[in-house]
Amino acid sequence: ALDYALELCRRLGFETKLCDKHRCGWAQIGAGETVVGILAHLDVVPAGSGWSYPAYDLSEENGRLYGRGVSDDKGPAIACIYAMKDILDAGISLKRRVRIIFGQSEESGEWDDMAYYREHEELPVFGFTPDADFPAIYGEKRLLNYKLTMPLEESGLLDIRGGSASNVVPDHCEARLLIDGREKCITASGKASHASTPEDGENAIAALAEKLASLLPQSPFVRFYRDRIGSSLNGELMGCALADIESGKLTMNVGTIGVTDVNLVMEIDVRSPVTFEADAVTEPLRRAAAEYGIEVELTQDTPPVYMDKNGDVIRRLLAVYREETGDFSEPTVIGGGTYA
């Protein structure tokens, strides 16, 4: 994807550079001492199941495009490339160079691409990422990822598997049980969505845990899930139902579950309101998990982004958007994490 994007930009007349063995790259137009940055990512979340169209082919029907990455974030990247091409073709004189920076590890949360860019390449004096919602985003919640580990107890649960990534609401989960000396397999289906909007999905791990409640009521895992997670999306049962005026409620998603050696491992994705520190989530989670013999590891803590929605940056973006669209919607805060 990165090779293609850079080749496309070269054909359109941009200056391009491939950075550090395909980790990231950029393409730019214009002249000037400083750079305005457009940060886009070319990686995608796992396709999952239930597609009506080939996930990794671009399909068009009734004026709509279908395929993994069409909206997040390959489609917006292409839109920005051709906006830059229009500026180039129009011969508009720019005070600064405009550079689109392509990354490839946004969805994984590693962001080693942007770390490399920051260390080795020129930093923009201003930037935005076309990776969220209109009209403009002035804040992103704190992103917390946790790994929960507990012994695979002798309560009849032999194996359990579900989910593809912590930042996706899982649409499938299956378990293998031993009941009255006989093995039994059960499955549960759900509806995938992004972990920042778990209300848009249906968590298959939660659905399977509910089924297990009647089959293995003494299982520590089953009791923990029932008592501390359940069907709640906002951390109420865990004791961390945080909220603030600017960014709303905390969201929590059990994204993956599996068995490694003799342990059961879950990954939980939390989007915490912008005014709270990580400990406001981590400490209640650890206390709740300890009651069931579960170890909690904080594997990612990405601080929140918060800008003045009445400041110059947001005001200018809104002015252009409103002039072109006639839409006077207010800027918002999101749960998703981006290159911003």
Residue locations for each model-derived region?
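Buried hydrophobic packing segments
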Residues: A5, A77-I87, L177, L208-L212
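Active-site metal-coordination/substrate-binding segment of hydrolases
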Residues: V35-F102, S108, H120-E122
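N-terminal helical capping/dimerization or prosegment-like subdomains
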Residues: A1-L39, D43-A47, V265-E267
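Histidine/acidic-residue-rich, glycine-tolerant segments that coordinate divalent metal ions
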Residues: K95-E202
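Short amphipathic alpha-helices in soluble, non-transmembrane regions
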Residues: E183-C185, A280-A289
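A short interface-forming secondary-structure element
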Residues: E267-F276
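An extended, acidic, His-containing surface patch that forms the Zn2+-binding/catalytic region
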Residues: E199-A206, E210-D261, T275-A280, E295-A340
